[in-house]
Amino acid sequence: MSVNYATLGDLKKGSYIVIDGEPCRIVEMSRAKTGKHGSAKAHVVAICVFSGQKKSLVAPVDTRVQIPVIEKRLGQVLADMGDMVQIMDLETYDTFEVEKPGGNEEEEQLAAKLQPGVTVEYWLIMGKPKIIRIRSSSS
């Protein structure tokens, strides 16, 4: 599990954070200064990268939180196996299986285009791969 650490107050909308052991993208963040002797609090709403679930976190802004390290890599689709796709990394030539994207209309369209021989960009987040997009054949 590759993670870095940062202060919660330094994060912004669009950043990534680990909540309940799952990598999430921050979609909403607000800070509130509490009473006379209290510390400022941050309220974070994030969407899980893999499951799409909405997660919430309320903590002091000086709390150290985990930030997932995201490796952006290229791979080639070798086989379509129903709800899984076999991919070969184009740098290391390792082969592995990845779950097809799904959940919303955009991800369903991406899953429909996954054919053997297609080059895809995938992210390796905390040791787990996720297909992000199809690379155009011109690049």
From Swiss-Prot:
One of its GO terms (molecular function) is ribosome binding. InterPro entries: IF5A-like (IPR001884), IF5A-like_N (IPR048670), NA-bd_OB-fold (IPR012340), Rib_uL2_dom2 (IPR014722), Trans_elong_IF5A_hypusine_site (IPR019769), Transl_elong_IF5A_arc (IPR022847), Transl_elong_IF5A_C (IPR020189), Translation_prot_SH3-like_sf (IPR008991). It comes from the Archaea. One of its GO terms (cellular component) is cytoplasm. One of its GO terms (biological process) is positive regulation of translational elongation. It is found in: Cytoplasm. Its main location: cytoplasm. NCBIfam families: eIF_5A, PRK03999.1. Belongs to the eIF-5A family. This is Translation initiation factor 5A. It comes from Aeropyrum pernix (strain ATCC 700893 / DSM 11879 / JCM 9820 / NBRC 100138 / K1).
